[in-house]
Structure formats: structure tokens, C-alpha cells
From Swiss-Prot:
Protein name: Sulfite reductase [NADPH] hemoprotein beta-component
Co-factor(s): siroheme; [4Fe-4S] cluster
Native organism: Aliivibrio salmonicida (strain LFI1238) (Vibrio salmonicida (strain LFI1238))
Residues holding [4Fe-4S] cluster: 439, 445, 485, 489
Reported function: Component of the sulfite reductase complex that catalyzes the 6-electron reduction of sulfite to sulfide. This is one of several activities required for the biosynthesis of L-cysteine from sulfate.
PROSITE patterns: NIR_SIR
Amino acid sequence: MSEQIAVKTILSGTELGPLADNERLKRESKNLRGTIVEDLQDRITGGFTNDNFQLIRFHGMYQQDDRDIRAERAKQKLEPLHNVMLRARMPGGIITPKQWLAIDKFAEENTSYGSLRLTTRQTFQFHGVLKPNIKLMHQTLNSIGIDSIATAGDVNRNVLCTTNPVESELHQEAYEWAKKISEHLLPKTRAYAEIWLDGEKLETTDEEPILGSNYLPRKFKTTVVIPPQNDVDVHANDLNFIAIANNGKLVGFNVLVGGGLAMTHGDTATYPRRADDFGFVPLEKTLEVAAAVVTTQRDWGNRSNRKNAKTKYTLDRVGVDVFKAEVEKRAGIQFEASRPYELTERGDRIGWVDGIDGKHHLALFIENGRLLDYPGKPLKTGVAEIAKIHQGDFRMTANQNLIVAGVPAEQKDQIEQIAREHGLIDDGHSEQRKNSMACVAFPTCPLAMAEAERFLPEFVTEIEGVLKKHNLPEDDNIIFRVTGCPNGCGRAMLAEIGLIGKAPGRYNFHLGGNRSGTRVPKMYKENITDRQILSEIDELVGRWATERQENEGFGDFTIRAGIVDEVKVSKRDFYA
């Protein structure tokens, strides 16, 4: 069978089976409208019904409930306490002080938890918004120039961009491209404006030239990266543009395609995967290449089995070279050889950083991205107080931290004082804590199998104790991440130690990632308790402290010492 016929057979669906029900849902949704308006008017239930439960994701929301009280409500013959989580669309994570004060006020007055959550998608989330407040939420955001279009669902989601503040023209150029890519790949339907902003209902076909009438087979994630920083974790994303500069000016991008971390417990046809390097493209071809990758995945992705619908599986099914050739054909280009670059670090530089324009930037470590007023540490109030006087902007990072960017010299002391008074600067935070993160998980995430955000702080304290026990200096820390389920939001599958929730109090224990985020870790122990994990870490760190080579990271040591095998090709090696 020729390559062309083989590809056509794959695309026709004859090898992939009947379409998943989500494809019917999207096709019948009237371009993402469904019957969401009718559901909003239904006060009998606090949730969304039938297809609308899925459709609201395309509008940036997930239906959730408080799982801590789910059983008690069931005893009382009550439905779960339904609410929504909203994820804002903020390409590059930049938000103004005026916008910040507005979202702070909304979170305080109209959410069940009174918090703001910075996320690994370089944006913020509201948690615990009840149905009567949903429309107000969207209208509040719209009034300050923010929306949540396409931050969830089978579309291109919030575009990430390296967040270190404007230290060069290159950073600003990269951010501008992140915005352009985001706008270019957005859904064109007017459903969002009609439903949430009371927009005029126009007679229109709502054609989707890039996403198509059935949108994408699965979610799609895009980044813009400035080497050597890999804060956005390129290998967690479907499409990555690696900025290539000449004399400090952006000249184009190396394009990496097919990364992704989600998998399904017990299903060896699912796995985390590094992205493949397609080559270099000049700036003027950036949007054409972005659209070509998206439309190729749109047409070739698996619409039968959603567990195998991501771009990474399409590449492994049809072949990287075949996929790349189709992208070249659609974009009208030939990829050039990749330009040299190196990714060496992922962490945010916490503290003050000087910009080239005489301004200063303060990166604040926000553990797990949760901004809340804790006893003795009113973090959320602290950021709001800074916003009241700040003349620059804020930058949310993909590590769930916050940068106060563009601070003039005369305001440095005042802003630092506010930050310290509210616990936003804590000199007691170790490097280990700064290099650890978790997804939300319980009590709000419906997919969580184990704790993550609530589990991480105390467990990191215990890891700190292990490092101290083995006389390791502060700089010798471990990239440690926890996710409550195998869907990958906490990016644990690019950590030196990654814990994946399996059941309450139990995790799959992965080892062997590296500090730069360019290697997938391998499972070391399955379904073990946190106490067992800590015991294993104690033993392994002891070996690392005594057996390592000079400047050898923990993940590199576990590979060299034969504790786990290196994952080079995920499809072949991850479960081997």
C-alpha cells in the first residue's frame, strides 16, 4: 500500500472506528451555543445538563462541585454543590493593575473560596462561581478587556510565552507573537458574545476556517519560548515556537510539534511524549505554520478515541515525516534546518531583576499559585495593595508565580515593603520549595484521584528534611511535582520526581526527568503511599549525595545509576 493510500485510509476513519460522542455534540452545538442560555435560566439545578456540561468548556469553564461535602449533601438528598471554574485567556500572562483589582474584587465577592488561582497555563482561574453569578463574571471580565474564549475544550488554548520581564526587545517581540498566534487560532463563532455579553444575534454561518465545523479532535496547546529559559515546558505542548535571535532581534522560530503529558492509568496506548523538532521558519511564515499544524491535526487527529486524539498520537500513528510534509504543503514552506539553541533552566528568578530600560521587576513565589488571605499571610490583599500603586503590569508565570514588572527605582522600596508585610516575600522559602508545584486536585477538580495542592506544602517540608539529613546544600534541590490524576496539569511528567495520583493517599512514583525539562521520567514504583514515597526518596537522596558526579542533578543520577531506564522514545520506552 502506498504512503498516500495509507494516510487516506487513516484519515477516512476506517481504521479508527465510529466517531466519539463529543463529535456529535460539537456538530449539533450550533457553533458552541447548544442550549446554554436555557440552562442558565433553569434555577432547579445549579449545574449544566447534557451536552452543555461539555460545551461550556469552549467558553473557558468547567463544571465542578465541592467534593469535600459531596457525600454529606447526598445523605441530605441534595445534588452536589455545582459551580464553575473559569480560566481566563491571557496570552503571555500579562495583566494590568486595573484589571487585577477588578478580578480580585470579583473573587472576593462572588466566588465560594474567595481566592485567585494562578495556573500552569500562565493565567488565573476563578473557582466556586455559582450559576447566578456566571453571566456577571463574563461581563465583569469583558468590562476590563479580558475573556475566557477557548481556554478549554477542543481548541487552541491560552498561548504561553516566556515570562521573564522585558529585559530585551526580544522578550517584547515574543510576547507580541504570542498574542498574534492566539488571535489567529481563536474560534470565530459569536456564541461567546451572544450568550454572556448579550451580543446581537446576527444571521451568520459562523464559519471556522482554521478550527472547522467540528473544531479539533482534542485540546491543543501552544507556546512561544525564549531560550535558554524553558519555564513554559515546551514538551508539554502540541506546538512550540522557539525564538531565534540575531544580534538581539527576533528573526524566526524553530518549530517543535507533538508534546503532551496526559495519559490514562492502565492504558499503555497512552503516554507522555516529547515534542519533535520540525525545523526553522522565518517570522513572516509564523501564522501560516501555526494554522497548518492546527489544520493537519484537525483533519488527521483521532476523532474515534479521545484518549488517543492529541497531536502526539497523530504523529506516532502517521509518522513524523508524513505529518511534517503535510504542514509544509499547507503552509507553502520548506522548513529550514533548526538553528542552534539550548534550554537550560525552568525556574522563575525569584526576587528583583533589573530591566534594560531602567525599570525593575519583582518575581514573587506563590506556593501552588493560590492567592488567598491566610492567617498571618494575607497574600491576596497584598497583591491588591501593590496593584493600587503599581505603574507597570503583572506577569503570571507558567510556574504559578507572579512578577510585578516595570517598577521605577523610586517605588522599589515601597513595593517590597508591601510584599514583605503581606507574606509575599518570605526569605524562609527554600530553593526546594520554589522548585516544587502541584495542580489543584481536591476539593474542586472532578478528575482528581488523590490530593495535590493541599498535599504538597507539608510533603515538601519533609523533602527539605531529607536533603538536610544528607548534608546537601541549598542549591542542590530536586524538581518535584504532583498531579492528582494522570491528565498532566501539574506537569509532573517532566519533573525529576513526579507523583501521579492513583487513589486517596496513593501515587505512581516517577523518576528520571531532568532540570531543563527535556526528558520524560519513568515509573519507579506504582500505587504506593506518601510514607513509602518519602522512604524511597530518603534512600535515593542518600545515594545521590554520596555517589553523584560533579554537578550531577538528581534526575540525571537516577538514569546513570540504573535506578530507572531513560525514556528516549515514549511509545517504545515508557512502559518497557
